[in-house]
């Protein structure tokens, strides 16, 4: 997939990260995160729930200063030690998951941050967007999962991109993910369900921002739903 945008993050305040929580169904594994969340150096643990920032969903449920401090400390420290690493931590898949989890919890985390901390959080988000789009450019349509696709769309919203090309790419990627009878090509019912959930979130994003020509999502959801109803 050949796709590239030039973007320059020079004025942090011009980017809006509010109202970007479009979560439909929460697939977070809270049971596993519960055993990790209060570890002193959580950010150093080589664990999927840490490296994907899925722990932020648990922190939000904790609420208050405790939840915000857990979120802030581990985002900032994780980024500090991993920013320039090149291995799997910055794969398109993990980058997309982290970006989504930060954006979906942004308003909670940012609610009591000082200006300097808030700017730091924004810089981390923009760094993730940059890394995501650079990786995204090297992927084939069939290599993009629905989380990467959702992160791509959210990034496009933040960067105020023309959605004519964005929707063309979204439609292409979705067509590569579904077979002729409407089954997700993982042929795994859980992944099929997650795919439906992410397409519903994409639909809500498009409706919220009044973006036109997103009807193809209804068609895809209809086919996927018919297959799911057979289980």
Language-model segments: residues:
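Extreme N-terminal leader/anchor segments
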Residues: 1-41
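Aromatic-lined, polymer-binding surfaces characteristic
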Residues: 44-221
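Anionic-ligand-binding alpha/beta catalytic cores of soluble enzymes and soluble regulatory domains
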Residues: 223-231
């Amino acid at each position: 997939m050949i796709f590239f945008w030039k973007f320059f993050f020079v004025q942090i305040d011009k980017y809006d990260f509010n109202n970007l929580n479009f979560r439909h169904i929460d697939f977070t594994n809270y049971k596993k995160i519960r055993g990790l969340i209060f570890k002193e150096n959580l950010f150093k643990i080589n664990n999927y729930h840490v490296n994907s920032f899925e722990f932020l969903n648990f922190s939000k449920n904790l609420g208050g200063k405790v939840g915000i401090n857990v979120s802030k400390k581990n985002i900032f420290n994780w980024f500090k030690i991993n920013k320039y690493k090149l291995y799997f931590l910055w794969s398109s898949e993990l980058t997309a998951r982290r970006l989504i989890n930060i954006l979906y919890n942004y308003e909670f985390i940012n609610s009591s941050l000082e200006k300097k901390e808030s700017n730091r959080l924004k810089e981390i988000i923009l760094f993730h967007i940059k890394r995501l789009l650079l990786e995204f450019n090297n992927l084939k349509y069939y290599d993009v999962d629905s989380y990467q696709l959702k992160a791509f769309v959210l990034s496009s919203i933040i960067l105020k991109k023309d959605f004519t090309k964005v929707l063309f790419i979204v439609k292409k990627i979705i067509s590569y993910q579904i077979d002729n009878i409407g089954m997700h090509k993982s042929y795994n019912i859980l992944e099929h369900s997650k795919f439906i959930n992410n397409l519903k979130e994409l639909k809500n994003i498009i409706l919220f921002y009044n973006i036109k020509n997103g009807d193809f999502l209804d068609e895809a959801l209809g086919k996927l739903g018919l297959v799911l109803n057979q289980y």
